[in-house]
Amino acid sequence: MYYGFDVGGTKIEFGAFNEKLERVATERIPTQTEDYSLLVNDIASLIAKYDAEFGVEGKVGLGIPGMEDAETGALLTSNVPAAKGQFLRKDLEAKIGRSVKIDNDANCFALSEAWDEELKDSPSVLGLILGTGFGGGLVFDGKVFSGYSHVAGELGHSRLPIDAWFHLGEKAPLLECGCGNKGCIDNYLSGRGFELLYAHYYGQEKKAIDIIKANEAGDADAVEHVDRFMELLAICFANLFTCFDPHVVALGGGLSNFALIYDELPKRLPKHLLSVARVPRIIKAKHGDSGGVRGAAFLNIK
């Protein structure tokens, strides 16, 4: 039995999956935001509850909005303040008496998609989230690639490539990122970035959904903005694809619902890729909000 926990800022979602990777249990509880010991106890209590229900000790995986320090194991997270700087994996292991896997929630999203029935035989799957932020994860042969320092999936904190700057023009905004650097693609390719760029160029704040509707209605500013954004996506994605050369790319987050992306990217990508490079298959993620808990559970698949 595989247990997955999607530990978010306001709630923890639990899911249990059998050996066929079918979900057989679901539970949601509020996230303890201040008391770390209660946070650990809440997770341990759910594990004990479902161990008793299924009569087995489930294999435990946690997905978190952050990462472990590769040297100390301390948790780097701002969205779960009770766990910031704490040794969540080690403390939970001591509490329940078994090993625990932990990874970034974007990596869990990618892993969930990679283990979808349709994609599980794909040698490499790149999961990209175009939501409030931009991030992702890379899965090789069914395993997350986290890298030397556990930051391999922090794609949103790579910088805009030079051709993207030229594409945005001389009035391009140099946006400051929450990580302390400037020019991180998180601030440009995310749903938030889609809105920020529109406000920057047209002096008017609009929600992404309203910009998309205006584009479909033929509004000149929205059409120009969407065209500029699609090319920006193609440039930045081409840089990522040149690094990773994935077989399949699964898109999640709010902007992944923008159907035009799946028409435009395959047409725009080739001119930004090496001449011998093939455009990967680009699809909308299948598992949506359940991807985090699925991927967390599947961290234990060998």
Swiss-Prot record:
InterPro entries linked to this entry: ATPase_NBD, N-acetyl-D-glucosamine_kinase, ROK, ROK_cs
- The keyword Metal-binding belongs to this UniProt entry's keyword annotation: yes
The GO terms describing molecular function are: ATP binding; N-acetylglucosamine kinase activity; zinc ion binding
Q: Which PROSITE patterns match?
A: ROK
Amino-acid positions noted as binding Zn(2+) in the UniProt annotation, renumbered to this chain: H157, C177, C179, C184
Q: SUPFAM superfamilies annotated for this entry?
A: Actin-like ATPase domain (SSF53067)
Positions that bind ATP: 4-11, 133-140
The pathway where this protein functions is:
Cell wall biogenesis; peptidoglycan recycling
| Origin: domain of life | Bacteria
Which reaction(s) are listed as its catalytic activity?
A: N-acetyl-D-glucosamine + ATP = N-acetyl-D-glucosamine 6-phosphate + ADP + H(+)
Q: Name one GO biological process term.
A: N-acetylglucosamine metabolic process
Q: What is its EC number?
A: 2.7.1.59
Per UniProt, the keywords (alphabetical) are: ATP-binding, Carbohydrate metabolism, Kinase, Metal-binding, Nucleotide-binding, Transferase, Zinc
What enzyme category does the UniProt record give? transferase
Entry's Gene3D superfamilies?
Answer: 3.30.420.40
Name the Pfam families for this protein.
Answer: ROK (PF00480)
Family the entry assigns:
Belongs to the ROK (NagC/XylR) family. NagK subfamily.
Q: What does this protein do?
A: Catalyzes the phosphorylation of N-acetyl-D-glucosamine (GlcNAc) derived from cell-wall degradation, yielding GlcNAc-6-P.
Question: Which protein, by its recorded name, is this?
Answer: N-acetyl-D-glucosamine kinase
